[in-house]
Amino acid sequence: MKKRLFLFLLALSLVFISGCAHEEEKLSKGLAEGIEKVEVPSTIPSEGLGNLCSGEEECISFCQNNRGQCEEYCGNYNEKTLCQKLFEGNTIPSDIPSCGDKTEFFNAYPIKLSDLEFIRPLGFIGAAPEHIYPTDHVYFFLKKDTSGHAIEVPIYSPGDVWITRIKEIKMEKPVPDSIDYSIYFSPCREFEAFYFHLSTVTEKIKSEIKPPFRYCQEEEIGRFKQVSCEKDVRIKLSAGELMGTAGQLEWQYSFDLGTFDMRTPALDYANPSRWNERQKHIVCPFDYFKGDVKDKIKSRLGENDILRTIEHICGEIEQDEPGTAQGVWFVKDAKMYARPELSLIHDFIDPKIGAFAFGFLPAEIGLSPDVLHFIPKTEGLVNRDFKDVTDDGNIYCYDKLVKQWSYDKKPEQLVVFIQLTSPTTLRIQGKESNSCGSGSWSFSSNYAELER
């Protein structure tokens, strides 16, 4: 009996084990089939700006009315392609022909030479606190009338180009109800140029400035308060074709020309993450003009009757020297689109002159917005060239500082202390005094900490 019961239980166990194995096989097969049936998306989901918006079209629409939120987000995520496109990235339409290896695009004068006083080079600092970081464009200064205001002069296309963007800026101050235009144009896909501060545009251009706009925003920058609207367009112009006029407005003494060549090696900023893609490829506009036109324009680079004679004749936008004090500095934890705080660089006309450019620094440190010059020294701790100041533990002192546009060259009652506390952090403070003395120096509690 026991033997029969044992055989029955053994047979039942075998059936159970066989059934479990079969079910496991079915389950495994089912899982495999399920995995095979999972559909992989054929495209990656469209890029967005975090929780603000998703997809390029939606984000462009959102940022038209919420530009501040978009700027704050992109300040933390500036590597995003969409951020670069929204905020001065390479926005040249892809169907415009490629530049190839061509480097001569322009053969016409932007302005008649008889209407021109001089051309201010790249890298201008001044008009504090508006231009504390070196400017990315040159200035064409216009002839003046007997009252000292710039005359209204025609402005021309320098070559065969497509206008790709237009910004119409309606001023509230300093001249209420006046209009200022910015025109972005390209001869080919990897190269972009712009004119800023045109007072009028031709009807061919003006007829395209209508809704829907890429964005509209209110902004207040220094002495300017304005509402600007930007429009994507496609307008073909020939070399020498009239684009509009500059001058006439009370505050408008010049118009600007800037250029970006996305084929060039990126500029060697100390902290590349601070700058968008276009800013990494700023170039001298006149390197892309032809022959005689190029030579005659470059011969006018300077300030009033003082010509720039030291290379780069066109000026220099990026002066950072990593691991030293030279270059631009930001308050700690500043976003990508931070307001300008500090530049420790060299003059845009005479690079032998050192220049402090103070922007929106804390008031308690004793340095108000200004540009001050000094003669750099190659040794010692007083007035040392910025490129020689490293994190060596020393405090450096600067005296006999002269205002940028000072006619009598009388030194200010001010000395400035700086110290590189690491290769990427800087301490700075001002003190009312006419001389550094013989040292040594120390900071009080009211100093500012900046970083690359």
Describe each model-derived feature in a short phrase.
Residues G148-I151, Y156, P187-L242:
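Short histidine-centered loop motifs in beta-beta connectors
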Residues I17-G19:
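C-terminal motif of bacterial Sec signal peptides marking the signal peptidase cleavage site
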Residues L49-C83:
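Secreted, short cysteine-rich peptides and small extracellular cysteine-rich domains stabilized by multiple disulfide
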Residues Q84-S182, S186-R189, G222, K236-A239, ...:
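Surface-exposed, glycine-biased beta-strand/turn segments
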Residues I179-F185, R234-D261:
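Short hydrophobic beta/alpha edge segments that flank linear recognition/processing sites
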Residues E379-R452:
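Beta-sheet ligand-binding and adhesion/scaffold domains
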Residues A21-E23:
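Bacterial signal peptide processing site
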Residues K3-L10:
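Sec-dependent signal peptide recognition
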